[in-house]
Amino acid sequence: MPSEVTPKVPERPSRRKTSELFPLSGSESGDIKANSEPPTPAGTPNVPTRRPILKAKTMTSFESGMDQESLPKVPLQRPVRRSTTEELNNVMNNTSKELEEIESLISKHNIHNVSRKKSPTSVEEGKVAAIHQNGQRSASDNKTSTNPSPLEKNEHEGAEGNESAISPSNLVNKSNNEVTEHSDSEDLTEKQKVHAALDNEAGDRSHFEEKLIPGDMKVQVDVSKDVEEGSLNALPPSGITESDDKAEKFTKHPESSLEELQKHQEQQEEKIFQNPTDEESTTSLNEKQEGKDNMEVNSQPQGPSDTETVIAATSSNVPSQIASEEENDVPVIPRSRPKKDFEAHVQKEELPNTQEKRVSEECDSTLISTEEESKIPKIPSERPKRRAPPPVPKKPSSRIAAFQEMLQKQQQQDLHNNGNSSATTASADIAKKHTDSSITSDTTKADFTSKLNGLFALPGMVNPGQLPPSLEKKLSSPDTESKLGPQDQSQAKTGPLGGTRRGRGPRGRKLPSKVASVEKIEEDDNTNKIEIFNNWNVSSSFSKEKVLIDTTPGEQAERALDEKSKSIPEEQREQSPNKMEAALCPFELDEKEKLPANAESDPLSQLPQTNTVGNRKAISEESLSPSEAIANRDQNDTTEIQEQQMEDQMEVDMERELSGGYEDVDSALHSEEASFHSL
């Protein structure tokens, strides 16, 4: 419908956050919103380049309604249990005077600058020097100007913007710091000044840390010692204790190198490991002293001076460190440097001397007592045992006992006989001394050997009373040897040394008849037989000239045989072993010269001729003498001719065997062809 107007939807009402029960009017609510909400910035906010360091915050709402006296006093450090109670009591008694002197000095001088304490765990190198330098600069900055720098403002704004990111443990630490500062009666202007000073310290620290710390190097340094030394910088140089002098030396050179820090740390560690008990005893006293100092500083009225510092509480890692020590038993470097206790040191030096004196006195007393005891005779508690008697020898057997008795009787008889003979020989020697000295020497030797009684076992030894025959012959006089004849001497030489031994064999049995009937052959070595036999036999024959002229070869051979048979007997023919039968007759040579001409023509007729030649050879060899046979061999050269004939005959035989009995090679070839065609 065109006449109708579209309805307007009203806006949804928005709920406003108000503290009152009834809603306000629109103008009033707009003014409240404008006042409560900050205006939006036109430009982009400044973002800090690095994360700001956590700063101590104050609780304005809590501190405003509370008085300074009503606040509870929280201790700086948790007390640590000590096991060595006796040493602590001694140290407390010895250091009471020093504590009184320190309290009097602190009450006289107003300490204006107190540096913040840090935890001793893993402090980076170069941090100690930066802390002292920052403390001095912060004091000078507070005197000259109270307005913070723009960099400090940015860091302060960034820290305020990141308040929501702070952990609860840091909040607890902040609250502890707020309690220890005791700044309830200060105005807002004074609080702003404190914040500016803290920002200056943080900025200077961050700036110097970037310059001084190279890389990620970390050195465990005892910072608590440096903090105490920084707190005592306001004291005059004429200090009583050694710690004041060392603090002045260390603060004069804030820009110390890394090498000095390392040396300082090594010295501290050596002292800690050398005397850990003294350090434990002194740490508790230092803690108490620090607590008193802090109480005095807080009790003094704080004027409107520009240079104001805040004592920071210990780090939040103290309870966690103690818990970790109890769990893991890991040693931790103490926070404060131990102070020398001169009286306790003197007492400890005196103790070993007194102990040594006591020990020496005890040693002297023991020596005197031992000397006195050595003079007094001691009665043994037990009597000494008697030695056991020697073992009784066993009784010998009956045979051994009888043998020993027999030997004793024989020795007694020998001694009795030797005594009589020695008396007779002594009288005879006195009479014959001048006559014959050789006889006396022999008799003395005989007496000496007779006294031995056969103690030495010699081969062929008889009874102990009787000397062996070899000694008797040597000791016998030369007259007795001359009296004996040659036959007796030969019999004595050939006589056996001992008796004949019986042959071992089966007893009670007879030998077999063959063995018993065998006659024993006895050889006489002294007899010699001479045998004569002929080694050579010589036969004589006629000369060549006579044989050729007188007789024919056949007759000559027959005559030679007859003469030989007559001249040589039959026994000599059998016994003569060596005969020279090498003679040849001259008629054989003529026949052998004729043989090669007839051998080729009549091969069959050759056999009877060879037999006849052999017979003639035997006849001629028997008839000729060896000298003649040798002469004939050298002159006629028949052996060479025979060898040549034998070689020719062997060659002919070999040709026949190879050709198969045919004289010519052509005939053999024709015969092979005929046999091949026939097949």
UniProtKB/Swiss-Prot annotation:
Annotated Polar residues bias: 133-149, 164-178, 296-323, 414-427, 437-452, 603-614
UniProt keywords (A-Z) are:
Cytoplasm, Cytoskeleton, Phosphoprotein
- UniProt lists compositionally biased (Basic residues) regions at 110-119, 501-512
Region annotation (Disordered) ranges: 1-85, 110-522, 549-580, 593-679
Q: Where is the composition biased (Basic and acidic residues)?
A: 9-19, 179-213, 243-272, 339-361, 372-383, 471-482, 556-576, 667-679
Entry-annotated residues carrying Phosphoserine: 36, 70, 104, 183, 206, 231, 284, 324, 576, 620, 623, 625, 627, 667, 671, 675, 678
The transmembrane residues are none
Please name the InterPro entries in this protein's record. Answer: Aim21
Please list where the region (Interaction with SH3 domain of ABP1) is annotated.
Answer: 383-396
Annotated Gene Ontology cellular components are: actin cortical patch
Q: Which residues carry this modification: Phosphothreonine?
A: 18, 58, 85, 277, 552
| Compartment annotation | Cytoplasm, Cytoskeleton, Actin patch
Provide the primary localization. cytoplasm
What family is this? Belongs to the AIM21 family.
Subunit structure as annotated in this protein's UniProt entry: Interacts with ribosomes. Interacts with ABP1.
User: What biological function has been recorded for the protein in this entry?
Assistant: Involved in mitochondrial migration along actin filaments.
Identification of the protein by name: Altered inheritance of mitochondria protein 21
